[in-house]
Swiss-Prot record:
PANTHER family from the UniProt entry: BIFUNCTIONAL DTTP/UTP PYROPHOSPHATASE/METHYLTRANSFERASE PROTEIN-RELATED, BIFUNCTIONAL DTTP_UTP PYROPHOSPHATASE_METHYLTRANSFERASE PROTEIN-RELATED
Enzyme class, UniProt record, top EC level: hydrolase
EC number: 3.6.1.9
GO CC terms in record: cytoplasm
Protein name: dTTP/UTP pyrophosphatase
Catalytic activity: dTTP + H2O = dTMP + diphosphate + H(+); UTP + H2O = UMP + diphosphate + H(+)
Entry keyword annotation includes Hydrolase: yes
Family membership: Belongs to the Maf family. YhdE subfamily.
Residues annotated as the enzyme's active site: D71
Transmembrane region(s): none
Pfam families: Maf
Length: 190
């Protein structure tokens, strides 16, 4: 059985598009970046920790379990933008992203007891239009930025702010479907 180690409704929705049966695991894995950790190392480590935590949870009951862990972070330079803690934090993030091109890093990891983990790191570039304070305040007030890395949802109202995207649209949402499908096929789960 395939298990998704994620609370994200977007990841659940995206994984359903691959027509692979799966169950969702509700896990709390700390997402704290070490001072000497690069953004790509960080996102890959968190995805691996989520997958391993999920495997530890289900392995006794399902020895053949395959667990998918994923993490997405918005990066501008060396700064990693996590999920905003409140509306003011969302506004600050959106002001920094306004008029600039940032990266969205999404790591996907598959683990099981029988083999080494399979991994993918997908890097997308997103160019934001220049936003004025009224646009930022209105978007932050709608609630959509909360719970989203970088304080925006590309699949939602923020799509109108995206001047250019290079990379994986589904990766920016939280689960790059092409790469996930390739990993699942290599693991024999697709």
């Amino acid at each position: 059985m395939l298990y998704l180690a994620s609370r994200s409704p977007r990841r659940q929705e995206l994984l359903q598009r691959l027509d692979v049966p799966f169950q969702t695991l509700q896990l709390d894995v700390p997402e704290l970046r070490a001072a000497d950790e690069s953004p790509d190392q960080y996102v890959q480590r968190v995805a691996l920790e989520k997958a391993h935590a999920g495997l530890a949870l289900v392995q006794a009951a399902d020895p053949d379990a395959i667990v998918l862990g994923s993490d997405t972070e918005v990066v501008l330079g060396e700064r990693v933008f996590g999920k905003p803690v409140d509306v003011d934090d969302a506004i600050a993030m959106l002001r920094e992203l306004s008029g600039r091109t940032h990266q969205v890093l999404t790591a996907v990891v598959l683990v099981c007891a029988q083999r080494a983990p399979a991994r993918a790191l997908v890097v997308s570039e997103v160019a934001f239009d220049t936003l004025d304070d009224a646009q930022i305040a209105a978007y932050a007030a709608c609630g959509e930025p909360m719970g989203k890395a970088g304080a925006y949802a590309i699949q939602g109202r923020a799509e109108r702010f995206i001047r250019h995207l290079s990379g994986s649209y589904s990766g920016v949402m939280g689960l790059p479907l092409y790469h996930t499908s390739q990993l699942l096929t290599a693991f024999g789960a697709h």
